[in-house]
Swiss-Prot record:
Organism: Ralstonia nicotianae (strain ATCC BAA-1114 / GMI1000)
The organism's place on the tree of life at top rank: Bacteria
Role description: Specific class of high-redox-potential 4Fe-4S ferredoxins. Functions in anaerobic electron transport in most purple and in some other photosynthetic bacteria and in at least one genus (Paracoccus) of halophilic, denitrifying bacteria.
Subcellular location as annotated: Periplasm
One biological process term in Gene Ontology: aerobic electron transport chain
Signal peptide: 1-28
Protein family according to the UniProt entry: Belongs to the high-potential iron-sulfur protein (HiPIP) family.
Name of protein: High-potential iron-sulfur protein
Pfam families: HIPIP
Chief place where the protein resides: periplasm
GO MF annotation: an example: electron transfer activity
Record: residues binding [4Fe-4S] cluster: C66, C69, C82, C96
Protein keywords: 4Fe-4S, Electron transport, Iron, Iron-sulfur, Metal-binding, Periplasm, Signal, Transport
Subunit architecture: Homodimer.
Length: 103
């Protein structure tokens, strides 16, 4: 088999590998949402669930955190995406008033 034919056959594999690699780079580029961000402040977001004001958010429970919220898109990672904060990551151990138990 010629080198050219071998090269042409490998293009789809290289393209797929490149796409997967680029997806990882794009994912890693998301900044963390700041607690002072207007959307975060409106939802009472805290990067550490233990720092939530119980008087202000009486429905908050110590075992509630972004990592076990239905909206969290980070799996078991220390930070991950949340549709409420487009383009920004939240802390796995964070919390906001939109917390909803994972099914």
């Amino acid at each position: 088999m010629s080198n050219r034919r071998l090269f042409l056959k490998s293009i789809p594999i290289m393209a797929a590998a490149g796409a997967v690699g680029m997806a990882g780079l794009a994912r890693a580029a998301n900044p963390m949402v700041a607690e002072t961000d207007p959307q975060a402040a409106a939802l009472g977001y805290k990067a550490d669930t233990t720092k939530v004001d119980q008087a202000k958010y009486p429905k908050h429970a110590p075992d509630q955190h972004c990592g076990n919220c239905a909206l969290y898109q980070g799996g078991t990672a220390a930070q991950g995406g949340c549709p409420l904060f487009a383009g920004k990551d939240v802390a796995n151990k964070g919390w906001c008033s939109a917390w909803a138990k994972k099914a």
